[in-house]
Amino acid sequence: MEALINEFYRCDIIQHGEFTLKSGEKSNFYIDCRKIFQYPNLMRMVCDEINKKIINSDWICGIPDGATPFATTVGLMRNIPLLMLRKEKKEYGMKRQIEGNY
Protein backbone atom coordinates (compact mmCIF):
# COMPACT_ATOMS: atom_id res chain seq x y z
CA MET A 1 0.00 0.00 0.00
CA GLU A 2 2.93 2.34 0.69
CA ALA A 3 4.11 1.95 -2.92
CA LEU A 4 0.63 2.94 -4.11
CA ILE A 5 0.58 6.07 -1.95
CA ASN A 6 4.06 7.01 -3.17
CA GLU A 7 2.83 6.67 -6.76
CA PHE A 8 -0.15 8.91 -5.94
CA TYR A 9 2.27 11.61 -4.84
CA ARG A 10 4.63 11.05 -7.77
CA CYS A 11 1.75 11.39 -10.25
CA ASP A 12 0.36 14.45 -8.44
CA ILE A 13 -2.90 12.69 -7.57
CA ILE A 14 -2.80 13.74 -3.92
CA GLN A 15 -3.01 17.52 -3.66
CA HIS A 16 -2.54 19.58 -0.50
CA GLY A 17 -4.28 22.93 -0.03
CA GLU A 18 -7.80 24.13 0.73
CA PHE A 19 -10.57 22.25 -1.04
CA THR A 20 -14.35 22.22 -0.86
CA LEU A 21 -15.70 18.71 -1.33
CA LYS A 22 -18.96 17.80 -3.07
CA SER A 23 -20.59 17.49 0.36
CA GLY A 24 -19.64 21.10 1.09
CA GLU A 25 -17.14 20.04 3.73
CA LYS A 26 -13.66 21.56 3.68
CA SER A 27 -10.52 19.48 3.33
CA ASN A 28 -6.80 20.25 3.41
CA PHE A 29 -6.07 17.54 0.83
CA TYR A 30 -7.71 16.16 -2.30
CA ILE A 31 -7.27 12.85 -4.10
CA ASP A 32 -7.95 13.35 -7.81
CA CYS A 33 -8.89 9.78 -8.73
CA ARG A 34 -9.68 10.70 -12.34
CA LYS A 35 -5.96 11.27 -12.92
CA ILE A 36 -5.31 7.60 -12.15
CA PHE A 37 -6.75 6.60 -15.55
CA GLN A 38 -3.81 8.35 -17.24
CA TYR A 39 -1.30 5.95 -15.68
CA PRO A 40 -1.85 2.30 -16.70
CA ASN A 41 0.56 0.91 -14.09
CA LEU A 42 -1.08 2.94 -11.34
CA MET A 43 -4.54 1.91 -12.56
CA ARG A 44 -3.42 -1.71 -12.33
CA MET A 45 -2.07 -1.17 -8.79
CA VAL A 46 -5.33 0.44 -7.63
CA CYS A 47 -7.45 -2.28 -9.22
CA ASP A 48 -5.26 -4.97 -7.65
CA GLU A 49 -6.07 -3.45 -4.24
CA ILE A 50 -9.79 -3.28 -5.06
CA ASN A 51 -9.66 -6.88 -6.27
CA LYS A 52 -8.19 -8.00 -2.92
CA LYS A 53 -11.22 -6.53 -1.10
CA ILE A 54 -13.84 -8.38 -3.16
CA ILE A 55 -14.60 -11.75 -1.60
CA ASN A 56 -17.20 -13.14 -3.99
CA SER A 57 -19.26 -11.41 -6.63
CA ASP A 58 -21.37 -12.33 -9.63
CA TRP A 59 -21.23 -8.81 -11.12
CA ILE A 60 -19.44 -5.53 -10.63
CA CYS A 61 -20.76 -2.01 -11.04
CA GLY A 62 -19.03 1.34 -10.56
CA ILE A 63 -20.74 4.55 -9.48
CA PRO A 64 -20.92 6.77 -12.59
CA ASP A 65 -18.81 8.15 -13.93
CA GLY A 66 -15.63 8.13 -11.89
CA ALA A 67 -15.72 4.51 -10.68
CA THR A 68 -16.76 2.95 -13.99
CA PRO A 69 -13.16 2.53 -15.30
CA PHE A 70 -12.16 0.86 -12.01
CA ALA A 71 -15.16 -1.49 -12.14
CA THR A 72 -14.44 -2.31 -15.78
CA THR A 73 -10.81 -3.17 -15.04
CA VAL A 74 -11.63 -5.27 -11.96
CA GLY A 75 -14.38 -7.05 -13.89
CA LEU A 76 -11.87 -7.99 -16.57
CA MET A 77 -9.36 -9.13 -13.93
CA ARG A 78 -11.96 -11.35 -12.23
CA ASN A 79 -13.74 -12.38 -15.43
CA ILE A 80 -17.10 -11.18 -14.07
CA PRO A 81 -19.73 -9.13 -15.92
CA LEU A 82 -19.91 -5.37 -15.63
CA LEU A 83 -23.21 -3.66 -14.95
CA MET A 84 -23.44 -0.11 -16.27
CA LEU A 85 -25.22 2.27 -13.92
CA ARG A 86 -26.57 5.49 -15.40
CA LYS A 87 -26.81 8.69 -13.39
CA GLU A 88 -30.45 8.88 -14.45
CA LYS A 89 -32.91 6.42 -15.92
CA LYS A 90 -33.22 6.71 -19.69
CA GLU A 91 -36.51 8.06 -20.97
CA TYR A 92 -36.15 6.33 -24.35
CA GLY A 93 -35.19 2.92 -25.73
CA MET A 94 -35.31 0.29 -22.98
CA LYS A 95 -35.66 3.04 -20.32
CA ARG A 96 -33.10 1.43 -18.03
CA GLN A 97 -30.99 2.92 -15.30
CA ILE A 98 -28.88 -0.23 -15.06
CA GLU A 99 -27.56 -1.91 -18.21
CA GLY A 100 -26.72 -5.60 -18.08
CA ASN A 101 -28.26 -9.00 -17.48
CA TYR A 102 -28.64 -9.49 -13.75
PLM regions: where:
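Active-site-facing substrate-recognition patch
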Residues: M1-K53
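Conserved hydrophobic/aromatic pocket- or pore-lining residues that grip, position, or stack substrates
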Residues: G24, I60, L82
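Anionic group-transfer/hydrolysis microenvironments
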Residues: R34, P64, E88
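Glycine-rich helix-loop-beta junction characteristic of Rossmann-like nucleotide cofactor-binding loops
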Residues: I50-N56, G100-Y102
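Short glycine-rich phosphate-binding loop at a beta-alpha junction
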Residues: S57-P64
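Conserved SAM/SAH-binding loop
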Residues: A67
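Short, glycine/charge-rich flexible loops or terminal/linker lids adjacent to PRPP-binding catalytic cores
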Residues: F70-Y102
